[in-house]
C-alpha cells in the first residue's frame, strides 16, 4: 500500500530538555524544552543517540515528487526523483499530480517548496579518526592505513550528515612528506567502522609539502629529516628511486619463477609496495600543498617518475600555476577563504577555486574541519561572491567534482539515473545561507532527520519587534539642498532601525547622512548615484577582532594581540594598530566599515580595546573611539564543578578591583587636600571600570563560567557586556534576569558536548533573543573577521529574525561600544557608513559592490583582489600562447 509523507504538514521536530543545575550537573529531565524549575536549576535542550535515530524509514526506496531538483549538472528545475534499492532510477522534469493512488508500494515524499541536492563530498576530512591523525615519527609512513583507526561513534559523523555531507575522504595529517593511506567513507550513523567504508573506492595516500612535514611550527628541537623544502624533494627522489628498484627486483623474481627457477623472493616491504602502487597507478596521491614553487616541484617529480597527482589538497597558491596544474591533470581541493594562519597561507585568495576551474582544473572546496564541513554548500557559494562563478559550477565544487577526484564520479556526486541515492532535502536553495537540511539520505536510507530541540524552526525571534513594525521613512521626507550633496537613489534601503524602504534614497553631506526616505527631494546640483536594483545597508561593525594587531598566525613578530605579566588594565591597543595591515582592506570588502580592535590573550585582564574605521593611513586616522572597553577573560569554571566557590584567579580579580577602588578614594582624598595624585598607571586605568563608570567586555563561554561571571559582575557592581557566551543557550533565562547584553560568537562552530543539539551554536543567538537578551554577533575568527555577515546569516537561518540579525552586526554592535548615536543605522545625523550590494547582505553569493566610510567612497580592491587580477592575467597569457 502506498504511504504519503508530506513535509509541508508534518514537521520533524523533537523537543527535549535537561535540567542544568547551578553546578552544571544533570539533576532531572523535565518535559518541555524551556521549562524553568522552581528551585535554583535551569533546563536546556539536549540530544542523545536515541533521539538521533530518524523516524522516516524508506527501506531504500521512495518517490520524492514536486521538488526543486539541483542535479549539479544544469540549473535547478521542478521534478520528481524515484529511488529503488538505494539507487536513483528516475529523474523527471515537471510538476506531478499526487501519486497516492499508485500501487507499487513506494513511500511518497511531497517535496513541494523544498530543494533536493546531491550529498556533499568532502575530499579532505579528519572526522571519524580515533587516536590522532598524525604519525610523526618518520618521514615516510606509507605502511600506515587510516582505516585502522576509523571511529564510527564520532559525533562529528552525525553533525556532518546534518550539513548534508554523505561522503568523506578520511586522511592522515600532514606531518609526513609521504603519509599513510586514506579511506573513503559513506557517512552513516549508528553503524560499524566496516559499514562506513565506501565499497571498492580507489585507494588513496596522503602526501604533504611545505611547513608541516618540515616541522616549521612544531617547536622544540627538530631532528627529523627533512627540515627544508629541498629536503622534501629529496625524500620523493630517494623514495621513488627505491620503489622503482623494488619493483624491478620483484619483476626479476617473477620472471625467474615463470622460467621454472626457484629464486629467493625479495624481502617484502609494505612501504615500498605502496609506493610501487603509486607508480603503477593503483594508489592515488592526494597531496597537502600551499606554495606555487612546491606545487610545481611535486608535479614535475611525479612526471619524472611517470605518475599523476590525483589532487592537490588546500593548494592555496594553486591559482599562481593554474595552467601548469591543468596541463598535468591534477585536481585541486582548496579552502573557500582561509588565509594568513601561517606564512605559506598569506597569499591565499578566495578566488582560488574559481580561477583553477577557469583554467580547466577539476576544482573542489574542502573543509579540513568538523565545523566547516557542516556548511560546505555555503563555502562553495563564496566562489559566486568573490569570482562570479556560475551557480551550477559552484554546486559541483561541493558535490560532483569531489566524486570525480575520488574516482567515484560514475557512482555519486550528482542526481542522475543509476547513481547512488545520496540525496539531501533542504528548505531553500543549497547555496543559500538561509537553507536548512531537512533530511540526508545515503544509499536510499534516511541517515539524518532534522530535530528542533529549541522550537525555533522558521521562527522570527527579535528582541526589538517595534523596529520591524514601525513606519519607515517619515511621510514627507525632509528636502535637502546645497552643494556637495551625494544621493544614492532607487535602491532598497535597509536602515536597521526600521523596516526596509523599497526605491529609497540616502543623502550624504560630508561625513554624515542628512536624509533617508522614499521620496527625498533633491536639488539640481546634487550628485546622484543610481542604486536601482541594489541594496543599501549600514556598514557592519566587527566586534572583538585583532584587526591591525595581527598579520600572520605562525609568525610571532607580526602578532601584538597579547601581553605577558598577567593583569594589564592600562595597556591599550590604540597605538599598536598597523594601518598598512592587509587585513583591513580584506575585511572591509565584506561590508565591514568599523572594527573593535581588542587584545586577544594574556590576562585575565587583557587590556583596553579601541574602535577603528577601516579607512586611514595612520592609527590616529583610523581610531574613532579610544579605549572603549576593558577586556577581561573570566577564569573558566568547569560545568561539572562540585561547588560554587570562586577559583583562585577570580578572587585575585576581586582583590585587584577593590585595590583600584581604594586607589581612587585615596587619590580623591589627596586631591581634596592639595596633594599630588598617587602614581600607579595600572590602578588609574582600572579604577573607572572597577567603579562601573566605564564598560567591561567580560569574556565567558561555558554555562558555569557564564553564571560565575554574572555573579562576579553583580557583586562587584560592574557595567559589563558578556562576550562569547557560546553556551548562553543553556542559561539564557539567567542572563535575561541579570539584564545583561551579550556579544555572541563564534556562531560557526561545533557544540562543546556530544550531547548538545547539533544546531546549538547556530541557534544560540535566537535562544538568547527569545529570552529577552539584547544581542550583538561577532565572528570570533582571527583570520577571517570578514565572515561576520555569514555568522549573522546563520543566526537568522536558525531562528533570529533577519532584522534582528542585521541589528546584531550594526546598531546593537554600536550600542555595545557606546556609539549608537553616530553609527549602526542609516539614519539622518549619523555617520555615512554605507554598503551597496547586489542582494541580501548575509548571503554567501551576494557581491558587495561599493562602500562609503564617513561619506568617502573606499576602494574595493585589496591584496587578494590584486593577486587574483595578476595571476588571472598570467593564466590567460599562458592560454593565449
Where in the sequence are the language-model features?
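Bacterial N-terminal signal peptides that target proteins for export
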Residues: 4-22
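Bacterial N-terminal signal peptides
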Residues: 20-31
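N-terminal pre-domain segments of enzymes
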Residues: 38-59, 458-482
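Histidine-rich, glycine-flanked metal-binding segment
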Residues: 46-60, 69, 73-117, 497-539
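His/Asp/Glu-enriched, well-ordered alpha-helical/loop segment
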Residues: 53, 131-133, 139-144, 284, ...
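C-terminal cap of metal-dependent C-N hydrolases
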Residues: 67, 79, 416-459, 489, ...
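Polyanionic/metal-chelating signatures
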Residues: 161-309, 432, 436-437, 442-452, ...
Amino acid at each position: 500500500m502506498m504511504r504519503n509523507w508530506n513535509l509541508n504538514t508534518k514537521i520533524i521536530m523533537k523537543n527535549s530538555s535537561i535540567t542544568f543545575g547551578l553546578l552544571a550537573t544533570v539533576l532531572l529531565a523535565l518535559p518541555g524544552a524551556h521549562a524553568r524549575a522552581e528551585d535554583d536549576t535551569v533546563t536546556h535542550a539536549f540530544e542523545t543517540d536515541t533521539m538521533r535515530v530518524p523516524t522516516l524509514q524508506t527501506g531504500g526506496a521512495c518517490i520524492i515528487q514536486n521538488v526543486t531538483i539541483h542535479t549539479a549538472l544544469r540549473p535547478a528545475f521542478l521534478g520528481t526523483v524515484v529511488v529503488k534499492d538505494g539507487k536513483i532510477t528516475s529523474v523527471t522534469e515537471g510538476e506531478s499530480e499526487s501519486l497516492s493512488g499508485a500501487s507499487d508500494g513506494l513511500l511518497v515524499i511531497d517535496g513541494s517548496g523544498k530543494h533536493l541536492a546531491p550529498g556533499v563530498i568532502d575530499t579532505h576530512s579528519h572526522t571519524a579518526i580515533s587516536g590522532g591523525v598524525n604519525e610523526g615519527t618518520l618521514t615516510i609512513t606509507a605502511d600506515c592505513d587510516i582505516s585502522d583507526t576509523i571511529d564510527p561513534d564520532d559525533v562529528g559523523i552525525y553533525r556532518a550528515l546534518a550539513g548534508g555531507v554523505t561522503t568523506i575522504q578520511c586522511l592522515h595529517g600532514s606531518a609526513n612528506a609521504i603519509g599513510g593511506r586514506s579511506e573513503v567513507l559513506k557517512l552513516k550513523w549508528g553503524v560499524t567502522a566496516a559499514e562506513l567504508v565506501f565499497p571498492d573506492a580507489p585507494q588513496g595516500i596522503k602526501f604533504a609539502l611545505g611547513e608541516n612535514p618540515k616541522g616549521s611550527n612544531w617547536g622544540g628541537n627538530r631532528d627529523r629529516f627533512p627540515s627544508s623544502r629541498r629536503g622534501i624533494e629529496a625524500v620523493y627522489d630517494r623514495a621513488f628511486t627505491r620503489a622503482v628498484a623494488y619493483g624491478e627486483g620483484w619483476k626479476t623474481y617473477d620472471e625467474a619463477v615463470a622460467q621454472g627457477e626457484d629464486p629467493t623472493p625479495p624481502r617484502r616491504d609494505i612501504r615500498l609496495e605502496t609506493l610501487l602502487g603509486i607508480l603503477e597507478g593503483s594508489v592515488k596521491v592526494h597531496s597537502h600543498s600551499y606554495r606555487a614553487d612546491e606545487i610545481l616541484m611535486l608535479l614535475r617529480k611525479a612526471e619524472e617518475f611517470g605518475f599523476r597527482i590525483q589532487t592537490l589538497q588546500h593548494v592555496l597558491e594553486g591559482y599562481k600555476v593554474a595552467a601548469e596544474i591543468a596541463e598535468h591533470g591534477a585536481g585541486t581541493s582548496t579552502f573557500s577563504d582561509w588565509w594568513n594562519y601561517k606564512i605559506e597561507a598569506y597569499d591565499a585568495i578566495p578566488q582560488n577555486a574559481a580561477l583553477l576551474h577557469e583554467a580547466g582544473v577539476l576544482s573542489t572546496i574542502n573543509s579540513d574541519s568538523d565545523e566547516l564541513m557542516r556548511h560546505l554548500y555555503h563555502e562553495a557559494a563564496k566562489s559566486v561572491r568573490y569570482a562570479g562563478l556560475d551557480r551550477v559550477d559552484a554546486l559541483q565544487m561541493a558535490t560532483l567534482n569531489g566524486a570525480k577526484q575520488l574516482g567515484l564520479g560514475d557512482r555519486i556526486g550528482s542526481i542522475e539515473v543509476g547513481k547512488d541515492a545520496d540525496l539531501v532535502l533542504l528548505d531553500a536553495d543549497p547555496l543559500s545561507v538561509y537553507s536548512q537540511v531537512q533530511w540526508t539520505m545515503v544509499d536510499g536510507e534516511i541517515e539524518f532527520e532534522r530535530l528542533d530541540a529549541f522550537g525555533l524552526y522558521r521562527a522570527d525571534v527579535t528582541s526589538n519587534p517595534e523596529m520591524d513594525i514601525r513606519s519607515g521613512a517619515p511621510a514627507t521626507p525632509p528636502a535637502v539642498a546645497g552643494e556637495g550633496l551625494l544621493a544614492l537613489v532607487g535602491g532598497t534601503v535597509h536602515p536597521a532601525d526600521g523596516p526596509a524602504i523599497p526605491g529609497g534614497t540616502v543623502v550624504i553631506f560630508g561625513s554624515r547622512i542628512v536624509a533617508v526616505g522614499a521620496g527625498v527631494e533633491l536639488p539640481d546640483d546634487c550628485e546622484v548615484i543610481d542604486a536601482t536594483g541594489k541594496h543599501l545597508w549600514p556598514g557592519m561593525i566587527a566586534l572583538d577582532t585583532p584587526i591591525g594587531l595581527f598579520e600572520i598566525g605562525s609568525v610571532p613578530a607580526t602578532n601584538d594581540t597579547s601581553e605577558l605579566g598577567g593583569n594589564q588594565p592600562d595597556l591599550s591597543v590604540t597605538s599598536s594598530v598597523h594601518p598598512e595591515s592587509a587585513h583591513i582592506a580584506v575585511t572591509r570588502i565584506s561590508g565591514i566599515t568599523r572594527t573593535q580592535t581588542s587584545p586577544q590573550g594574556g590576562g585575565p585582564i587583557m587590556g583596553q580595546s579601541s574602535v577603528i574605521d577601516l579607512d586611514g593611513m595612520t592609527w590616529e586616522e583610523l581610531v574613532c573611539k579610544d579605549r572603549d572597553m576593558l577586556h577581561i577573560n573570566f577564569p573558566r569554571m568547569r560545568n561539572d564543578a562540585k561547588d560554587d566557590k570562586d577559583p583562585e584567579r577570580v578572587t585575585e580579580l576581586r582583590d585587584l578591583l577593590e585595590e583600584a577602588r581604594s586607589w581612587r578614594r585615596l587619590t580623591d582624598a589627596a586631591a581634596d587636600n592639595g596633594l599630588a595624585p598617587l602614581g600607579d598607571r595600572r590602578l588609574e586605568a582600572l579604577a573607572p571600570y572597577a567603579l562601573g563608570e566605564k564598560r567591561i567586555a567580560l569574556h565567558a563561554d561555558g554555562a558555569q563560567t557564564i553564571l560565575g561571571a554574572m555573579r562576579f559582575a553583580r557583586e562587584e557592581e560592574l557595567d559589563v557586556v558578556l562576550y562569547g557566551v557560546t553556551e548562553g543557550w543553556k542559561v539564557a533565562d539567567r542572563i535575561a534576569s541579570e539584564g545583561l547584553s551579550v556579544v555572541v560568537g563564534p556562531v560557526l562552530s561545533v557544540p562543546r558536548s556530544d550531547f548538545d543539539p547539533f544546531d546549538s551554536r547556530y541557534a544560540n543567538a535566537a535562544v538568547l533573543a527569545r529570552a529577552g537578551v539584547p544581542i550583538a554577533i561577532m565572528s570570533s575568527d582571527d583570520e577571517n573577521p570578514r565572515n561576520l555577515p555569514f555568522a549573522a546569516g546563520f543566526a537568522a537561518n536558525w531562528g533570529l529574525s533577519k532584522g534582528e540579525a542585521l541589528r546584531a552586526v550594526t546598531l546593537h554592535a554600536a550600542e555595545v561600544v557606546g556609539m549608537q548615536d553616530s553609527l549602526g543605522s542609516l539614519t539622518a545625523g549619523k555617520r555615512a557608513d554605507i554598503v551597496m550590494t547586489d542582494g541580501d547582505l548575509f548571503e554567501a553569493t551576494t557581491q558587495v559592490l561599493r562602500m562609503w566610510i564617513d561619506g568617502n567612497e573606499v576602494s574595493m580592491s585589496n591584496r587578494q583582489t590584486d593577486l587574483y587580477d595578476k595571476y588571472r592575467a598570467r593564466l590567460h597569457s599562458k592560454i593565449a600562447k
